[in-house]
Design a protein with these regions (language model features):
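Carbohydrate-active catalytic/glycan-binding domains of CAZyme proteins
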Residues: 1-349
């Protein structure tokens, strides 16, 4: 049965009838086809064994129906490999370098020994095979968390990333997109989790640069924030929470991973989000906020109290995660996201 609309939060099946596994992902448009890639969470069942089991990719021409292209970056059985599935492999981002004719993929990885760094791979095709060219890379000698990669019309590249638990950094990329030049700017300095901004999702419209960010509460959702600037390096002005009418302060129980513009549409941008924990939607944001604040300010008892009160699992079973794709509309130049139980591309300009 073919899909003819988006149904945010519901299980999204591929053309084979299996749940799509492309979490923390992004969408690229290449030669008339959309490619959606992301983390495969099918083996992340809550036993602490696997975090991400490889990176998968899907293709579509209508954005509703997706064909499984398999692993573009398969898991490794080598415990020393950055792609070993017990490492915390998160948020792959792929860009194309016209100069080198290479697809360049950056992946954030928290290793078993606690090191948080970046692995960089390249390939001749979006579907791979990818070759690791750099691992345990610490850009600007910083611990790098969630991020986005952006390529400007002049082909300069920019890397927006969370300097872990402190602030957001915008770093200029080298011409081959496999390193940073050393030029960078700092944004949104805050006291620590749960308020520090992470999961930056960039998009541009009418010469303005927008960043949607998340708070720092792991897989538990929190209020999003959007900011705007006239240049890639800012300065950014915070516009507030784009999710209109979200009384739960959870971004409609999701975390946005990326934003893309629909081809052939004048103003249709889609915010791609993950509902990481659909079975824990009863946990209020206030409890999550207090739990993370307790953990990161030394009040461990407060955090553990909330864990017990809501019977929270030690390891989250993100295998059941779903997707929340919603349109971004612009009201007086301010991006807004409204909830839709279902919606169609055809309903927007």
């Amino acid at each position: 049965m073919k899909n003819n609309c988006f149904k945010p939060g519901q299980v999204w099946l591929d053309t084979n009838g299996a749940p799509i596994q492309a979490h923390g992902g992004s969408v690229l448009f290449i030669n008339g086809t959309y490619y959606w890639y992301g983390e495969n969470k099918e083996k992340t069942v809550g036993d602490g064994k696997y975090w991400t089991y490889g990176i998968k990719c899907y293709s579509s021409t209508d954005l509703y129906n997706w064909q499984d292209l398999g692993f573009i970056i398969p898991p490794s059985e080598d415990e020393k490999s950055p792609l070993y599935p017990q490492n915390m492999i998160d948020r792959p981002h792929i860009v194309y370098n016209e100069k080198t004719k290479k697809f360049v993929c950056w992946i954030k990885i928290m290793y078993l020994e606690g090191i948080q760094a970046v692995t960089i791979l390249t390939a001749d095709k979006i579907t791979g095979p990818y070759t690791v060219i750099k691992e345990k890379f610490r850009p600007l000698n910083m611990d790098a968390g969630d991020f986005d990669l952006v390529i400007a019309p002049d082909k300069k590249g920019y890397y927006y990333f969370e300097k872990v638990h402190t602030e957001l950094i915008c770093a200029t990329l080298t011409d081959d997109y496999t390193d940073v030049t050393g030029e960078y700017t700092s944004h949104f300095p805050l006291e620590g989790p749960p308020f520090v901004r992470e999961a930056p999702a960039y998009f541009t419209k009418d010469g303005k640069h927008y960043l949607i960010t998340s708070g720092t509460t792991g897989y538990y959702p929190n209020p999003s924030e959007i900011a705007v600037a006239s240049h890639y390096h800012g300065p950014f002005t915070v516009l507030g929470n784009p999710h209109v009418g979200d009384e739960t302060d959870t971004s409609f129980h999701s975390q946005i991973s990326s934003v893309f513009k629909v081809q052939g549409k004048k103003n249709l941008y889609i915010a791609c989000g993950d509902r990481w924990l659909p079975n824990l939607m009863h946990v209020p944001y206030k409890a999550v906020r207090d739990m993370f604040k307790g953990w990161f300010t030394g009040d461990m008892a407060k955090g553990e109290q909330i864990v017990k009160e809501y019977n929270l699992p030690k390891y989250e079973a993100t295998c059941s995660a779903t997707y929340v794709w919603l349109p971004i509309v612009f009201e007086n130049d301010k991006p807004k996201i409204y909830w839709h139980n279902s919606w169609k591309i055809e309903d927007f300009e």
